[in-house]
UniProtKB/Swiss-Prot annotation:
Gene: CLUH
Repeat region (TPR), residues: 978-1011, 1020-1053, 1104-1137, 1146-1179
Residues carrying Phosphoserine: S279, S281, S654, S664, S723
Localization per Swiss-Prot or TrEMBL: Cytoplasm; Cytoplasmic granule
Low complexity biased stretches: 1279-1290
Name this polypeptide is given: Clustered mitochondria protein homolog
Gene Ontology terms, MF aspect: mRNA binding
Record's compositionally biased regions (Polar residues): 636-651
GO BP terms in the entry: intracellular distribution of mitochondria; mitochondrion organization
KW Repeat (keyword) present: yes
Stored CDD domains: CLU-central
Family note: Belongs to the CLU family.
Residue ranges constituting the Clu domain according to the UniProt record: 335-577
Amino acid sequence: MLLNGDCPESLKKEAAAAEPPRENGLDEAGPGDETTGQEVIVIQDTGFSVKILAPGIEPFSLQVSPQEMVQEIHQVLMDREDTCHRTCFSLHLDGNVLDHFSELRSVEGLQEGSVLRVVEEPYTVREARIHVRHVRDLLKSLDPSDAFNGVDCNSLSFLSVFTDGDLGDSGKRKKGLEMDPIDCTPPEYILPGSRERPLCPLQPQNRDWKPLQCLKVLTMSGWNPPPGNRKMHGDLMYLFVITAEDRQVSITASTRGFYLNQSTAYHFNPKPASPRFLSHSLVELLNQISPTFKKNFAVLQKKRVQRHPFERIATPFQVYSWTAPQAEHAMDCVRAEDAYTSRLGYEEHIPGQTRDWNEELQTTRELPRKNLPERLLRERAIFKVHSDFTAAATRGAMAVIDGNVMAINPSEETKMQMFIWNNIFFSLGFDVRDHYKDFGGDVAAYVAPTNDLNGVRTYNAVDVEGLYTLGTVVVDYRGYRVTAQSIIPGILERDQEQSVIYGSIDFGKTVVSHPRYLELLERTSRPLKILRHQVLNDRDEEVELCSSVECKGIIGNDGRHYILDLLRTFPPDLNFLPVPGEELPEECARAGFPRAHRHKLCCLRQELVDAFVEHRYLLFMKLAALQLMQQNASQLETPSSLENGGPSSLESKSEDPPGQEAGSEEEGSSASGLAKVKELAETIAADDGTDPRSREVIRNACKAVGSISSTAFDIRFNPDIFSPGVRFPESCQDEVRDQKQLLKDAAAFLLSCQIPGLVKDCMEHAVLPVDGATLAEVMRQRGINMRYLGKVLELVLRSPARHQLDHVFKIGIGELITRSAKHIFKTYLQGVELSGLSAAISHFLNCFLSSYPNPVAHLPADELVSKKRNKRRKNRPPGAADNTAWAVMTPQELWKNICQEAKNYFDFDLECETVDQAVETYGLQKITLLREISLKTGIQVLLKEYSFDSRHKPAFTEEDVLNIFPVVKHVNPKASDAFHFFQSGQAKVQQGFLKEGCELINEALNLFNNVYGAMHVETCACLRLLARLHYIMGDYAEALSNQQKAVLMSERVMGTEHPNTIQEYMHLALYCFASSQLSTALSLLYRARYLMLLVFGEDHPEMALLDNNIGLVLHGVMEYDLSLRFLENALAVSTKYHGPKALKVALSHHLVARVYESKAEFRSALQHEKEGYTIYKTQLGEDHEKTKESSEYLKCLTQQAVALQRTMNEIYRNGSSANIPPLKFTAPSMASVLEQLNVINGILFIPLSQKDLENLKAEVARRHQLQEASRNRDRAEEPMATEPAPAGAPGDLGSQPPAAKDPSPSVQG
């Protein structure tokens, strides 16, 4: 298995089959710079083919690229079906050995048609181990156990179960005939109105998973290592094998290859046994001695190479599954060996064994970045080292908590212990030496690592040359929080007091500064909005800082300038920090703030700071414009446009961020007034600052919005304001007062703008959260911390259109309950010994979710043993408290604690005392709550049907808890050039230039693959958009291929039931239908509906879209009754969430009417179409095309109804003998069904004349130039720390309706 985004070239080639084989770059002006038209330089990368001669098989051709390394051809051969059993070989060209690490273009004489000979090389111990590991990987290549166990970056995918393999030409294509009989019956549990929520269908058993047994046992022999005399005969190691025929054999791995020896389990005899067959490959030897192996191994490899490459490639970060079927534990020599060595990734392949993580992390940052190829190389190296470091840190953190690592201070109390393992430093999230005594003790110590990680993430994103941060990973495991950090060279040899040359080690009592640090941090202060400021130290001397006092600067022995302890990078959140004598604005007081939180490290999010500054910039422009209007009351100057010259005095923000309210009430709300204000703002922007009146205007506006400069808009925050123990000089009192006011305004802005804005967006379906994670994501995108969840829910409750926010309220309550339960679970687990873990977790789940009134915890059997022995065990792992207090918890007590926690932490009153009351009051589902708590805590449960509602027995037993995984937080390094390409492509698509957009997004895909390898969330978003574009441009096959990759990738990197995966399934179903693969389309839609039911339930706006899709496809295959069930459900849901007069509801009525027409039930059809017609007439007017279409259809229905009635009357008059031609009911054509599917999925093909098109493009280009002028100004002046992901950009969690994702003139949202 390949680790952490590594990908053999063969898989890359398959994975990138849709992409052109080239690598494109940008001009030096900077990525995505569209002002002069994006100049794309093509790096010539024409491939050529070489002939491969390998022993024992026919020669074959291989397409290669000059930029590939020789090593990548090795990897291709190790993956091919006919050469996969070889690992120890070299490639020869004209008798010369090719170097592993040289690029093909540098190999002399290598050209089109060259012959490369595969030559078997002698083994070493290392090569023999690699060979055995590779054979084991081949034998396990279809076995999903590594994915269920969450190891080696394996993860699950179930798409192939629903598509019968590949959807491309190679796979089993569905018949294209429209009227082919196909099985359309959905399972009972996914029908609208079904109360059943089974868990087993979540992970259907793939036919390939019942593995073909090639061998019973392959393991290292107990006779290892070979004695000295045998080493001198070339013996490297011994293997023990039991074949499928039950033959036990002992095998010698020697320098020349593998052969049978005469040893038995108890008798060592290394001499060769008969048949005397020496094979260079272990597989060839096993083929000789076991007919079953020979037959099954061949079948296994055939199946392996038939699987889609995206099902096999390792993901960059480990994804864990919260459920797993019961699996047999098979013997596995490689797994056993890995468990007892500190192998991380492929450690033993690297000289020097353990890696110097700090050196690797910092060296990759120092790589050059002047042009695109350099930046790609740098970003790929950063990403690779980072994913490796995260894997190593996670493994180390688990080893620390499990007690398998010796502490560096073993004599101290468990909580105070620190650890070093594999060159990584580990500390536990407890308040050691009362460091956080004034900030909330252990609670503050638990929160500090995540704040610090956010700081590291931010400084890494700003990426200032010469400033270094530590590799940081935060791991929550078994109730403990472990921080893993790379080690600054020399830090362990010195006291902290000596090391720190900038900042404070005691929260501001002693403070030092350093000119070099001030210079470096000054460069970050602009994008991070941090104010350079003075504080007083313990000797009352003024010290200048450009960060919070806790931020420490240490110069390592390597001469690098490191910053650490970045927990206060962002300003404090005053809503949760009561300060005696300070009053908050009225908006805060009205909402019940300030509220004392359990710690004093509450900070505003970076997104909030950015949104606040943007809001202030708008206010600044409006104030300045209003003053100009007053000055120019007599005569108005002609405004010059923003394009002509960038603003010299106004910086940083785009002209008109959507959705931001104006802060000033004075200006008129009429459109003409706003237009005037905008013109005047542009006048100021174009002014060069010489006009004294403009200077005066700008000075006044700067003062009003709190800018630190009087000549330019520049808002920054002092992160030390309101920090306990930090004092400011007398001379700065005015500045401090202004800064305090700014912080109060920011706190008020969060409550008065951001939270109402979020609720409004949810109401208008601009965002569609589906589960707790997507709700948290949309809150964070707006800078709203999760501690405000109670306030969000209160606002939803008070909203006039409360029922239209039912889905948000339900998700929010579920999130509030599971987060409160997680807080309790964390402390609960800390008191559990390792031997009691499954009993304790199953007891907690019973108390949390089971209706059984008094579950009894099963104490582990060894609790009954005398405890004298325990007195000797002073230094236990952190979890070994010998505490059975957990066993006495009751459901009543747990739910009382959950309600208390909800009140204390979120300030929300839950109206439930048991799980059943919670389900009844808030419409929650127990299976959804189980999923949410499992994902948040790392629990893995057995895949089976749980009887949550049984009052006679508890839902969970010890055997149902299979595992507990770590929950890992880490930095996500970005592929910046690829991201800019992606944004430029989106912009082109939105302007209607689909082909150009498609090319740019293809480029982005190439670059994403270059940096991240084949698997990544952002690559997934790229593939989704590419598929949509190909679909719009009529290339269904390409759309299908890209969307299949997007689904597989979403399953693998985000989770098989993640809301994004559900959306990807829906898109794929549409493209399958368009390609006449009807039964596959239905299978995919049924899967999406099942996942939606499991993750949320029935009553969600997204369910209306899903049911419309299902209903339409069923209508197309003439399953009218089934179709009506789904379409009528969609109509009910749409009516609830969009209101009875919405256009979506009119469309829903029309779809239902069409099915009734097909059933010849004209009265019902007329009734629904009339409803639709009324809505169109009211909303759009009688002359609108839609209204006219509906009117025509009504006439048509009326005529059919009259004709039917006439026929019926004829029958009544003349009896059955009447000679009446049979009524003709035609099935809907596939084209008409597809047309409706496109409409509901937000894809409209608008017929435009050439003139219309030209006018539209001219208008779009004009607007785009204005936007670009503003954007380029931002980019030139302010290298932003992080870009907010645009709709549908990488990072988008699928929380928006498809319509909002890819709008364009030809793709109407």
